[in-house]
Amino acid sequence: LYTLREMRANVLARLPVEAALLTETEHALIVQLILCGGQARIDGWQELSAAESLLRRLWCTLEVDEQDVLLHLPRELMIPLSLILREQRHQELRSRLLFFDTDTKAALYLSGMLSAKQALSRLYESVLHDSYANDEALALRYLKAGNDFYYNRAGELFLLHPGLADPEKILREGGFPMGYQPDLPSERALMASRDLLPEEFETDAQLSALLDSCMGLETAEESSAHDLRILVKQHVTWSELMEVVRAMLPIPPTKELTACLHRLYAFTPRWGTYR
């Protein structure tokens, strides 16, 4: 068993490596804690998940009152973390992680899911192989903390696009996911990381406008067209798509909207089919 002093020494010793492999939300929360004198109000489930991760690292404590959830960073860690975040090696590694995350989000949008083994290999190849943060356990935790994930029946770990409802269906209908695309142009990769491809842009814009018209500007949701596109990627039938659309709208779909949905259904690449 560790003594309290030994636990504190271990936390301090691992601080640079742990800080290097924080997720984007965890890293932003640490910056906020430092800027706010060691206290930050937690807002939303993403920040709460990040706060719980910092608790497990023994960095922070959580305080819950009637109105707020407050995260506290002890003074003993504020100065060391502040210095670490300013180090050039930390900033360079975080910059490489940003490119890795963009590639991973693009791969997930193109494929729906991604082998964690391939993602881990890519993370080592592009970020960690020659760095001070070469720690496989932390690298795997980074992947799982920053993405939805799933274990198949064989125990293999996959990272998932957040819109994917049934990973087993993708594996059944399309085989193994295509993974990273090393020759993907940077502009295309950036758009894919934001859940849109250049060839999908026009239909997406038209569909958004038509949905706005049918739903009324006061009730229209910006994500509706995106949600329908993600649904089509998952091999739903035309009748299933139209059932969802009718449930969304206060009026029957117009001819223009139906025609646009036909284009969406015909030309949206399905996950697992590579077309």
Regions found by a protein language model. Give the residues of each.
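Accessory beta->alpha helical hairpin/"wing" motif in late/C-terminal subdomains of nucleic-acid enzymes
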Residues: 2-12, 61-90, 152-174
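Short alpha-helical segments that sit at the start of domains
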Residues: 3-26, 86-101, 199-203, 216-218
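Short amphipathic alpha-helical interface segments
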Residues: 12-47, 99-127
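Short, charged/polar micro-motifs that form catalytic or ligand-binding hotspots
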Residues: 20, 40-44, 90, 94, ...
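Short amphipathic alpha-helical interaction segments
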Residues: 41-65, 130-142
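Short, amphipathic alpha-helical interaction segments positioned at domain boundaries
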Residues: 74-110, 165-193
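Long, charge-rich C-terminal accessory regions
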Residues: 131-244
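Long, highly charged low-complexity segments enriched in Glu/Asp and Lys/Arg with interspersed Ser/Thr
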Residues: 251-275
